Amino acid sequence: MVAIPNIKIKFGPQGSVRTFQTLSDSSKKIEHVVTEDLSQSSEKSKKRGGPKELDEVQPKKKQRLDCDWSSQCLALLRFLMEHRGGWLFKEPVDPVKMEIPDYFNVIQKPMDLGTVKSKLLKNVYSNADEFAADVRLTFANAMHYNPLWNEVHTIAKEINEIFEVRWESLMKKKVLRLSWNEVREGYKRQPVERDCSRRSSTGTSASSGVGLTKPAKENSEKGSLSSKPVKVQSKKNTPAVTPKALATCKCGRIICICLKSCSSFGSDVCSLTDCQLKNISGAQASELDPQSNGSDTSKKERNGSLKSQLDKPSNSDLLGNELKTAFPALPPVPPEKALRAAILKAQYAGTIIKAKHRIVLGQNNKADLIRIQIEKEQMERAQREEKARIEAEMRAAKVAERMRAQDELKQKRESQRLEIAKMKKGFDFERNNHSKLKKKFVKVCGCFSLTKARLLLEELGLVLKNDYCPELEVIGSEKFDAMRMDDLEEGEIL
């Protein structure tokens, strides 16, 4: 055995590179053998293929339909199956049972709603378009096999139209949801650094004095940091500020990062406010920079342009006014539901407070426990007051309803009384009594004989009709019979 001193082998893309001291012939032979082995192993690895080739050979994982879309598709499918003619498409077509032996000759790809439902439950579909294609194929087969005058053809056409309308509405909702998610995610990637402390005149003078003492290097570093999306600032870079300036900040810090959640129709507002904030911060940095080349007039012009930009009505105000006018006011909540909500809020006050703070409090932190207890008591007190107010409103509503019912009953009784009075006035039984009328007639005419009464009335210029005097008709008929008796001959029968 021959020892090989200080051998160094480096592996590269072209093979192995050797660096070692000059050796004897035997050591050179060993070197040649080692290099040949390394070259052979590299060639074999190239023939077998690298990790990229292995990745290409491995099959990609098939995508599946997400839960939200599958639930919406399942609800739409159930709606179609519950249609008055949906039972025709629930099961696959049986040519033997329906006595249609040529069905599979006409229809090459049979499909039904039951099969679509089973595939949907087994999560076979990779996207929603496959589901829609199977549903359309079901109704297309029915319309293709059955003629136009067949009832199955008309029902399939009707259900297919319903499906197309509902599917179009689902696709519109999906597009709106995707656009909203993209806007929200894109805005979350660009957090905006905003100055939360609105300093007073004294605070601004103190902070500007401190900033002027710092070198230009720190100002350049601050400018580079402000241009990038910063999430946390170190304590070394924060300038010293007077207590008055600190008191004006609500969150207790000089600069905080506010991530504004941007809605689907508020993205323009967000971009506009970001540009205004960047312009203001750039103007302040240029004013604080001691090495900036510019006169006082240029600074005044810049400040005037900034003020004019801020004084102009922004798109946020316009959009806010549009939103106020576009959405109508919500209807008032019934007292029963409001009382139920107040009771539930009072019952779960502790849970609501924990959810607002989003932390799990420990037993050792007494300050937080006391603060949470105070907030819980305040919430319970507010809920009790709201509950009492709602109960008082309910009692007042019940009293008002009772009074309204009594008023309606009184009005109904009064209307009935007036109707009875009108009916009694229209026909009074006491005044229209037959005996009283007879007595008055005798008193006026002097007798109750119809003949004398008729003569008296004729003298007064009044004539009674035959309808109102049946006795006169009888007398007239008797006269007519007597006249006919005179005209009769012997032996003639009347």
Swiss-Prot record:
Record's GO cellular component terms: nucleus
One Pfam family named in its UniProt record: Bromodomain
Ranges of biased composition (kind: Basic and acidic residues): 50-61
InterPro entries: Bromodomain (IPR001487), Bromodomain-like_sf (IPR036427), Env_Response_Regulator (IPR052442), GTE_bromo (IPR037377)
Chief location of this protein within or outside the cell: nucleus
Segments forming domain Bromo: 64-170
Keyword entries, A-Z: Bromodomain, Coiled coil, Nucleus, Transcription, Transcription regulation
Coiled coil, from the record: 366-428
PROSITE patterns: BROMODOMAIN_2
Annotated stretches, region: Disordered: 33-61, 191-237, 286-318
Biased composition (Low complexity): 199-209
Keyword Coiled coil: yes
Localization per record: Nucleus
PANTHER family reported for this sequence: TRANSCRIPTION FACTOR GTE12 (PTHR46136:SF19), TRANSCRIPTION FACTOR GTE8 (PTHR46136)
Protein name, as recorded: Transcription factor GTE12
Species for this entry: Arabidopsis thaliana (Mouse-ear cress)
